[in-house]
Amino acid sequence: MGRILLARHGNTFGPGDTPVWVGAKEDLPLVESGEAQARALGEALQAAGITPARLICGPLKRTRRAAEIVAGLTGFAGQTEIDPRLTEIDYGSWGGKSNDEIVAEFGQEALDCWDKRHTRPDGVDWSPSDAELKANALAAMADAASSRGLALVITSNGILRYMHAALSGDDGNAKVKTGNLCAAELGGTTGSRLFWNEKPDADLIARHFG
């Protein structure tokens, strides 16, 4: 069995911005508050006395920058690994649209399907396929859990929802807020959630990984 930390990158919209759906093709950088969220994660790890043995992230700017900030604060001296399986979902014609625009074009039920029930709406032009996303989520976690030492995985909300679905435990809410942290324990092809969607906290991290 191996334990891993999973984190969502920080904010990509500032206070005056209208949030839109940001997928694989919307490669936005972290805004100032998003960088602060990455620093909060790095500082929590530092306070818990933990330096990751591996730091793994998706190829998009927002996850790579978050990993860079965490590496600098924790004294991580290795090479950050870029795993394409951690790339956010390509939301197709939903990408770049606000929730109001999506409801107007596709209907409230389609939005609720993903936002409230955490299932992919019927007929959407998202990619990869549902099956591929599920397989990638479990494989990426299993690979990270095979590390000698703690692996920290930084990815995006859509991928974290598929990771949540691949793990056992209290179902709860699969959504992970920007900058928040999750933990899982993997063994073979199965795994369980240790905690989900928590603000980075040194005591919480030390309790599970100290």
Residue ranges and their predicted role:
Residues 1-3, 89-103, 161-210:
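Acidic, low-complexity terminal tails and accessory targeting/binding regions
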Residues 2-3, 7-78:
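Active-site-proximal alpha-helix that buttresses catalytic centers in soluble enzyme cores
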